[in-house]
Each structure stands twice: as structure tokens, then as C-alpha cells.
Amino acid sequence: VRKDFLDYLKFLFKQKQCEKISEIFITTNGTQLYRYAEYLSLYGVNRINVSLDSLIKEKYFFITNGGNLDNVLKGILKAKKLGLNIKINTVLLKNFNDDEIESIVLWCSKNKFSLSFIEVMPVGELHSSRKTQFIPVNIAKDIIKKKYGLTPINFKTNGPSKYFKTNLLNSKIGFISPISQNFCKSCNRIRITSSGIFYGCLGHDSSFDIKPYLNNNRIEELENMLKKRIYEKPEKHFFKIDGYSAVNRFMNTTGG
């Protein structure tokens, strides 16, 4: 977590109070959630998206290179107690968490959390492949449908999830399918990293640094550059799950 994270959050909260922005969402791995949950509630965060790929301690420790699942769950439950809306994002990984799909659905239903299952994307080390990890979302849909039923619902967010409900109470499940069901034509996302680098697409390296504009008060130039780059967003990504990574950049660098 950046040392000045709360300063940024306070700034965004003021913008929200002035109605310059309508919502504040936070995406996190949850490791610092217990510490910051009260601040997130105080400064108007509308929803917390928590990346959580396993509910089994040993698996979580492995996939996060030493993370403590108990601490993350404590943070999530504290945020829930404070009234924050929580959405769990789970990347589907073959032979790793495909045996947890049902238990994750049940846990989210019990705690009234929204849930999205996401296909793994070929990003990261250029000479690595995600082929052995890939599971299409339809596999997860079939598993859930057989156990709990699955019906599409007319619910949309600003993101790419397609939502369904099950026979369980408090159960709303989204599926994000960048590989098997490309949604690039409806993508409305841009990303600015913590180091000030603008990216128009997760699947392309095209970028520019916004810091020189901000540091020299070239705000109008920056606005024009942002408009230009948004207009020039690529038509689609070129992810191929049976090939090597498309970009040499990890998701935690860009922001999910």
C-alpha cells in the first residue's frame, strides 16, 4: 500500500462530495484490509473488490508467495461489519482451484458477497504460458448450474461481468471471459498505474507517463492527451491462451 494512500482517498472523497465523481471502488488483495477498513468506510468507498483465488490456507499461501489467509478473511469480515459492499474476484486456475468453485460460491452466498469468476489471462513473463492453467468460464458455469442452478439476470455494472443468479440466497455471480468470449468491443476501461503510467488496454504495451504533465501544471495538454489515447484504444487484445504472454507486465502492476 502506498504511504500516501489515505491522502489520495481523502482527495477522491472530496471530489465525490462535490459530485465531480459518483463512485469510489477499491481493488485489493486484502492483506491490509483489516487495518484500513474503517478509513474506507469513513471516506465514502462504495465497494471493495477483493482478489481471492482460494479459501484453503495452504493453497492461498502458495499462490500469494506467503500470504496469510486468516488475516485476509479477518479484513473482509471487518469491512462487511462496517457496512461496506464487497465483491470477490476469483481467477479460475486449472488443477488449482477448480475443486473450490462450489465452496467459494457457498461462502459468498453465506456472507452476502457478490462474486466474479475470471479467466486467467496471458500476461506476465513473456516466455511463460498460461495454457496449463486455463479454464473457460463455461466449465465453472456447468459446475454451478448442476449444483445450484444458474439463471441469467438483467444486471449490469460498468465492468465486463455477465451476471447470473443461483437457487441460493444472496447469490449473484458474474463471469468475466476475456479469452473464450471476447468483450473488447464494449470495454470502457483505462488504467493509470501507481507510478503514473497510462495504459489503454491490458493486452497492449502502448502507454505514456502522465507525471511530466502534472508536475509542470500542463493540465489542458494532459486532458487532450487522455482524450486522444482513449479515442485510440485498440480494437481488441491479441491474447492467445495456447501461446506465450502477450505483454511483459503483471496484473498487479497495471491494476485489475
PLM segments and residue spans:
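Auxiliary Fe-S-binding modules of radical SAM enzymes
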Residues: L106, K110, V120-G256
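Radical SAM/AdoMet-radical enzyme domain recognition
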Residues: V1-I118
